[in-house]
A protein has these predicted regions:
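Active-site histidine-anchored catalytic micro-motif
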Residues: 46-59, 63-114
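ATP/NTP phosphate-donor binding region
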Residues: 1-65
């Protein structure tokens, strides 16, 4: 993988210095970072409004399978989005080779894809 598409479907980053430093290191290794703006998005305790985070998830169906999708952090909040996720479209993208990874709160999304 030479490109990582970041998503932030759960909690906001408490300290953006660490993820920004990680992104700089990845760039220095030749990895292209997409959607880096999600790192600094904040709405209350979440990484954006429910609408922003849901749109970001549903756009995964359009991401090239040549890219790795990585959730920035877990925390709390993805459960609010689960009923409105376009599961069929995202599952089709995964069948086409899209890889998605995350941890913690993001596990609820991963379980929904089973």
């Amino acid at each position: 993988m030479k490109a990582i598409h970041l998503i932030a479907p759960s909690g906001a980053s408490l300290d953006v210095k660490s993820p920004l430093a990680g992104m700089e290191w990845l760039k220095s290794q030749g990895v292209q970072i997409e959607n880096a703006a999600c790192v600094e998005r904040v709405s209350e305790r979440f990484a954006g409004s429910d609408q922003e985070r849901l749109a970001e998830l549903n756009q995964l169906a359009q991401i090239s399978p040549q890219k790795l999708v990585m959730a920035m952090r877990g925390g709390y909040g993805i459960h609010r989005l689960l009923p409105d996720i376009d599961w069929a479209a995202i599952a089709k993208a995964i069948q086409g080779g899209l890889q998605i990874c995350g941890h913690s709160d993001f596990t609820a999304f991963e379980m929904g894809l089973l």
